[in-house]
């Protein structure tokens, strides 16, 4: 069964998609932009602070589904400047510990709303 997951503790979708979808024992979390759910705005123009907000948003959605980031199986990180990679890794280790989730990281030309970072995740519910 497919179950949408939604929380006001993370920003609403900026397009026709769900914050997350629960299928079986997995939670597929849509890419999170660095939007502060309280204001609906970017928290910062700084890539490091944007990454932190993206991960806070992922954390809020995981909690809404009854899980947490420690059960993350895979993430995909999108950056508009791969030069931010090392700094983003430092933020990342504040939210994840070993064994780290599988991950892909790509440099992209642009992200929605002019963001510098977007992060999506697949999280176990067991």
UniProtKB/Swiss-Prot annotation:
Gene Ontology CC annotations of this record: cytosol
Keyword Iron: no
rRNA-binding as UniProt keyword: no
Keyword set, alphabetical order: Plasmid
InterPro entries named in the record: RidA (IPR006056), RidA_CS (IPR019897), RutC-like_sf (IPR035959), YjgF/YER057c/UK114 (IPR006175)
Single Gene Ontology MF annotation: deaminase activity
Homology family: Belongs to the RutC family.
Protein name, per record: RutC family protein y4sK
Source organism (scientific name): Sinorhizobium fredii (strain NBRC 101917 / NGR234)
Upper classification of the organism: Bacteria, Pseudomonadati, Pseudomonadota, Alphaproteobacteria, Hyphomicrobiales
